Structures are given as structure tokens and as C-alpha cells.
Amino acid sequence: MLPFCFEMTSMSYIGRFAPSPSGPLHFGSLIAALGSYFQAKSQHGQWLVRIEDLDPPREMPGAADLILKTLETYHLFWDGEVVYQSQRHHLYQAQIDHWLQSGQAYYCQCSRKQIKEMGGYYNGHCQELHLDAGAIRLKMTQPITHFDDLRHGQMHIPLELAQEDFIIKRRDGLFAYNLAVVLDDIDQGVTEVVRGADLIEPTGRQISLYRMLGQVPVRYLHLPLAMDKNGNKLSKQNHATGIDLTHPASMILEAMAFLGFAIPKELHQANLDEILHWGVQNWRLNQLPESLEITARFSNGTA
């Protein structure tokens, strides 16, 4: 359960876009931003922006401001204040302290090599050793082996992964993504998460966290991934090029085509606000591609 009470908002639709500041927004980021924006606005909901700056060694100086500037340039205006995870460490630590005190979490000193020797999944080796340093793992009492995706139906998680006691605070003192994102979504009243299909497996762990916290899980919608011509996911880690800030309308239209919109010719003559308004009015989940990976001509807007 939660160590203290979150201030819950109303149950009207609240979505969010939560990029990490490890580089500029690329075409794959735009897909996630647009999908979450259209899903929220088509339901007259709020669209929040949260900067997930949990991992300083991987962050690019100035990237957070550049991301926000890019969203504004593309007229993807968010509701409320931007939230930064780097300012919320107290929230994460309070929950971890509660779990440590209750015995729900424990320290682990197993190396990656040791876990590989276990078969690739952590087997709970340190659970009863009563260590006082290392990474912190959560005892998994609510494993999730499947969940319902709003577009793709039932999604399955490998049993070994679902049952694993996963890390909630790293050995280097950095907070783990799964814990932070769930606590933030609860705190911000998020009702639905729209994001890329590369996060399907973490979804199981996040639903487990909701249940262990005594909270109702959000709904999930996973969007197809934009791949480059070599079949690699467009990502900051793969050095994907930032999207063009000088021609946002054409980039928005290309991203909308990727998301399955049948774009009328006249929309190519419309301004940015008109394009986005049309997108909100014509957004349908059943138009999204069934494939979760799309290797096509899309590569940051270039053929």
C-alpha cells in the first residue's frame, strides 16, 4: 500500500506524454506524442507533459527545453505545468522506505553475470540475506502475465519475467523507471497511457505495481514503432535525427499517415491548427496499424 495519501484527481480522461531528455524528439517520439494527444483530445481530456529525467548520465544538456520548444513549434500544447521527475525523488524514496521497512523490498548485490547464470531471470537469491547495500528489489506478490491493450487486445508477458523481483532503485542510487512512472501517473491522476510498443513488457510490471499499491491500473494503448530502413527502432540510443522544426505541418501529416489516417488532399493546404483539429475529429483506434513494428519509408520524415 501507499505510505501516504496521493491527492487523486477526477476520473475524467487524463493522458500524458513523457519523454526522456536524452536527445531531441525524433519521428518515433512524434508518433507517441501525436497518438497520446489525439487520444486525449478526442475524449475532451487533458494532455499532460512530464519530463522523465531519471538518468542524468544519459541526458543531453538542454534536451528538456528543446523537447518543450519542439512541442510548442508543433502546436502540441499541454495542459497544466510540466512535471520533472528529477524534482520528485522524495516521492519515490518515501515509497521505497515504506517497502524496506515492511519487508516488501530488499537489497540485492547480484551482478549481471550472476543473473545470466541463473538463466537470465533473477531468482530471488538475495531475498533472505538481509543485506544493507546494493540495488533494491521489490518482492513480486502480484505477477501479471497478460493485460488488455485498447487496440491489440490481450498481450502476454513471459511468466519468468512477470514473477521476477525487479529493481526499484539501482545500485548507483538512481530510481528505476517502472516505480517512478507508476507513482507519477497515480499522483497526476492519469487514466490512460498511450505509448510505443517497445514498452509492452514493462507494462506488466507497472500493472503489478498498481495492484501492490492498492490502486486501479490505468488503461494502456501501445502504438506501432517507427523503424529505420535497417529494421532498427528509431530512438535516441540509435542516434535518430531530431524532427524538423521548420516544416511542422508536413511532419505532422507524415506522422498521421503512419498512424493510419486517410488524409484528404485538401489537408495538405491547411495550417497546423487545422490539421491537428482534423486529426482530433477523425481519430479512431481501429485505424491504427495492426502490426506493432512498421519498417517502411518513414525515417524522421525522409524516404
UniProtKB/Swiss-Prot annotation:
GO molecular function, one term: ATP binding
Example of a GO biological process term: glutamyl-tRNA aminoacylation
Residues spanned by motif 'KMSKS' region: 233-237
Position of sequence motif 'HIGH' region: 19-29
Protein's organism: Vibrio vulnificus (strain CMCP6)
Family: Belongs to the class-I aminoacyl-tRNA synthetase family. GluQ subfamily.
EC number of the protein: 6.1.1.-
Record keywords: Aminoacyl-tRNA synthetase, ATP-binding, Ligase, Metal-binding, Nucleotide-binding, Zinc
A Pfam family assignment: tRNA-synt_1c
Annotated protein name in UniProt: Glutamyl-Q tRNA(Asp) synthetase
Job description of the protein: Catalyzes the tRNA-independent activation of glutamate in presence of ATP and the subsequent transfer of glutamate onto a tRNA(Asp). Glutamate is transferred on the 2-amino-5-(4,5-dihydroxy-2-cyclopenten-1-yl) moiety of the queuosine in the wobble position of the QUC anticodon.
